[in-house]
């Protein structure tokens, strides 16, 4: 086990307080790729930042995140700084938010090799240029000497991905690596992640097709809750949670827009109950209570449809056993 996240919650201590992540658990094995998917605001990016100690000071983080046996959440900043970059590589969300405007992009992509692998500057930049050309980043002739201001947003984002890959860390944590990219560039990112044979990946994305392409397992989040977690093929072919089913049905190739096909409930059960209930076609009185996480054949789902005796019957109809 490389990363073991146990019951991580994040609350922001301001105003009335905002619960951004609630009791999320997942694991990432060595060389495994896990994607966290969900709508904007579901808490998936905040979970990633919590693991890396990159949230603001008003964030209250509880739970555990063991990386090779060491709890990242309890770890001192100075100790974590030694791990980040060398063993954990982070690709932030946004078009090059992590790039220094005063340094060439070629040097910045090469810097993790220079800093953590102690590779000579000339050799590291040569490797960076090779990788950048592969991702079609920058001018072919000037790729080593260009500055961020000469790059488009998509180029900056691909440069950040190249920086994360070149470090050779045990694990890459990527936040929306395909955001703002066209289909051709997304294919380049897919190819890049497929090339990572010895590195694990924990990736946040709203793009289910991208998750399908690269994932071994997928965790689905909705309104700060983890609602489903299963092997990727199993989850995409046989989704159990109503939200996951609706999200997959809303994929463009399935012909349904996300606003269609939902039976709206008459009450908002956000306080203490299932947060998807107001949009769920299976909503019932029991949904006013918080559903437990049920596990069936390695497939986890947080829904009253799969809880208790009634849940066992419903699960068996879907070919599942507790």
Q: What are these model-derived regions, one by one?
A:
Residues 146-151, 155:
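Conserved ABC ATPase signature
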Residues 166-170:
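A short, proline-enriched helix->beta-strand linker immediately N-terminal to the Walker B motif
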Residues 141-144, 231-322:
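Short catalytic/signature loops enriched in Gly
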Residues 180-256:
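P-loop NTP-binding/switch modules centered on Walker-like glycine-rich loops
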Residues 172-175:
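Catalytic Walker B motif of ABC-type/P-loop ATPase nucleotide-binding domains
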Residues 60-71:
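Conserved ABC transporter NBD signature motif
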């Amino acid at each position: 086990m490389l990363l073991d996240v146990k019951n991580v919650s994040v609350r922001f201590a301001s105003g009335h307080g905002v619960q951004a992540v609630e009791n999320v658990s997942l694991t990432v094995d060595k060389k495994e790729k896990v994607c966290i998917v969900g709508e904007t605001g579901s808490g998936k990016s905040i979970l990633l930042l919590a693991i890396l100690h990159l949230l603001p000071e008003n964030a209250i983080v509880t739970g555990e995140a063991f990386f090779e046996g060491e709890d990242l959440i309890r770890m001192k900043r100075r100790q974590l700084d030694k791990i980040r970059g060398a063993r954990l590589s982070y690709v932030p969300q946004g078009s090059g938010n992590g790039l220094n405007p005063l340094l060439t992009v070629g040097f910045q992509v090469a810097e993790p090799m220079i800093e953590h692998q102690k590779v000579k500057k000339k050799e590291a930049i040569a490797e960076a240029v090779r990788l950048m050309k592969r991702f079609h980043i920058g001018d072919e002739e000037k790729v080593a000497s260009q500055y961020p201001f000469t790059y488009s947003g998509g180029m900056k984002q691909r440069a950040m991905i190249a920086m994360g890959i070149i470090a050779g860390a045990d694990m890459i944590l990527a936040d929306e690596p395909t955001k703002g990219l066209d289909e051709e560039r997304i294919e380049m990112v897919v190819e890049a992640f497929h090339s990572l044979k010895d590195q694990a990946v924990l990736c946040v994305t709203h793009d289910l097709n991208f998750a399908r392409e690269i994932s071994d397992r997928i965790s689905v989040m909705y309104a700060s809750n983890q609602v489903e977690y299963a092997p990727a093929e199993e989850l995409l072919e046989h989704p159990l949670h109503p939200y996951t089913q609706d999200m997959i049905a809303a994929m463009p190739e399935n012909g349904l827009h996300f606003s269609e096909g939902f039976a709206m409930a008459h009450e908002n059960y956000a306080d203490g109950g299932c947060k998807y209930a107001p949009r769920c076609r299976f909503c019932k009185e029991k949904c006013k209570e918080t559903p437990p996480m049920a596990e069936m054949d390695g497939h986890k789902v947080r829904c009253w449809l799969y809880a208790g005796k009634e849940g066992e019957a419903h699960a068996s109809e879907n070919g599942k056993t507790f």
